[in-house]
């Protein structure tokens, strides 16, 4: 689904939906306040305040890489949005498809252990049976089932939190004050000032703000330079992907945005191939979209390129110190709890 335009700014339609937003917000707040199940290992949640893309997946992968450097054994836990399997199941990229486990888990499972489960407690149990020393939740900030030791919230610097209102009046999944109360750190990705008011609000509560940007793979960028491309993406913020291509010096001759987690049909693929062949364009998409496209020989023959992106942090040492401190505090709480 593409988010409505009125979610980005306050408008009459947004105002008219406020009564429904108040009801939705009250239900969401009541749900968030429920105590979650505590487990034997620390749980770090990478989430956001709103629906749509913000950069959670690259953040999750960066966090996992850091945890491995710290001699931890991280396992990613996801609900597998868009997948048919309830789980819990460990994702096998050679056996599973995006239709079964979701595009993000399938993409991440190529480099990190990933468990998919609609029941997050059951998923955490499976992750611990795989000797996880830390569980990294990809999304699930508003879900109360599993108690979280650390909540790292990711916000896009250009989009911020839209009009700051709750669904359906705006993009927020729950009232902002409650979400801020449960935030341990804020990560702002990209250039822009739309997230600054949230950062200021959290700073007043002593919550640190980190900053970073998404960096495309240099070798892939170099290979695409000098070519005109047809860029397509079915992610939370396709425009950010198109902007990343342009900022890298790639000529984007045509754009085709799709809804987030869009299941590509044969007609979609045929239309993309026809346009690319007609205008002499190279097809470029995201790694998430490539996971959903699956095995499409005609796309491979046409030279489809998926552009890998990674999170580049402005203060890697600060991020490292934050994670080490939070893990230490989480384990200390468990030690003190076991002594009672």
Swiss-Prot record:
Its EC number is 2.7.1.130. It is an enzyme of class 2 (transferase). One of its GO terms (biological process) is lipopolysaccharide core region biosynthetic process. ATP binds at residues 50-57. It catalyses: a lipid A disaccharide + ATP = a lipid IVA + ADP + H(+). Pfam families: LpxK. GO terms for molecular function: ATP binding; tetraacyldisaccharide 4'-kinase activity. SUPFAM superfamilies: P-loop containing nucleoside triphosphate hydrolases. One of its GO terms (cellular component) is plasma membrane. Pathway: Glycolipid biosynthesis; lipid IV(A) biosynthesis; lipid IV(A) from (3R)-3-hydroxytetradecanoyl-[acyl-carrier-protein] and UDP-N-acetyl-alpha-D-glucosamine: step 6/6. Keywords: ATP-binding, Kinase, Lipid A biosynthesis, Lipid biosynthesis, Lipid metabolism, Nucleotide-binding, Transferase. Transfers the gamma-phosphate of ATP to the 4'-position of a tetraacyldisaccharide 1-phosphate intermediate (termed DS-1-P) to form tetraacyldisaccharide 1,4'-bis-phosphate (lipid IVA). Belongs to the LpxK family. PANTHER family: TETRAACYLDISACCHARIDE 4'-KINASE (PTHR42724), TETRAACYLDISACCHARIDE 4'-KINASE, MITOCHONDRIAL-RELATED (PTHR42724:SF1). NCBIfam families: lpxK (TIGR00682). This is Tetraacyldisaccharide 4'-kinase. It comes from Rhodopseudomonas palustris (strain BisA53).
């Amino acid at each position: 689904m593409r988010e409505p335009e009125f979610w980005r700014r306050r408008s009459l339609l947004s105002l008219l939906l406020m009564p429904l937003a108040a009801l939705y917000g009250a239900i969401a707040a009541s749900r968030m306040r429920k105590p979650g199940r505590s487990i034997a290992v620390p749980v770090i949640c990478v989430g956001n305040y709103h629906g749509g893309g913000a950069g959670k997946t690259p953040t999750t992968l960066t966090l996992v890489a850091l945890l491995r450097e710290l001699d931890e054994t991280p396992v990613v836990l996801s609900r597998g949005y868009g997948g048919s399997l309830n789980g819990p199941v460990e994702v096998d990229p050679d056996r599973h498809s995006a239709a079964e486990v979701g595009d993000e888990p399938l993409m991440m499972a190529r480099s990190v252990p990933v468990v998919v489960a609609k029941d997050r407690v059951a998923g955490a149990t499976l992750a611990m049976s795989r000797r996880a020393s830390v569980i990294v939740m990809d999304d699930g900030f508003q879900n109360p089932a599993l108690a979280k030791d650390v909540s790292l919230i990711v916000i896009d610097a250009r989009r911020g939190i839209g009009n700051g209102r709750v669904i359906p009046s705006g993009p927020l999944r729950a009232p902002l004050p409650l979400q801020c109360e449960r935030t341990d750190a804020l990560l702002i990705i990209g250039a822009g000032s739309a997230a600054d008011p949230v950062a200021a609000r959290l700073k007043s509560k002593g919550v640190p703000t980190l900053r970073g940007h998404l960096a495309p793979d240099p070798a892939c960028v170099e290979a695409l330079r000098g070519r005109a491309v047809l860029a397509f993406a079915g992610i939370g913020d396709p425009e950010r992907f198109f902007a990343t291509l342009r900022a890298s010096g790639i000529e984007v001759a045509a754009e085709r945005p799709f809804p987030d987690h869009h299941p590509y049909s044969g007609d979609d693929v045929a239309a993309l191939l026809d346009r690319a062949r007609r205008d002499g364009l190279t097809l470029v998409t995201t790694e998430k979209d490539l996971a959903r496209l699956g095995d499409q020989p005609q796309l491979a023959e046409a030279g489809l390129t998926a552009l890998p992106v990674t999170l580049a942090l402005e203060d890697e040492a600060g991020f490292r110190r934050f994670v080490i401190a939070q893990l230490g505090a989480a384990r200390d709480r468990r030690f003190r709890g076991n002594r009672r």
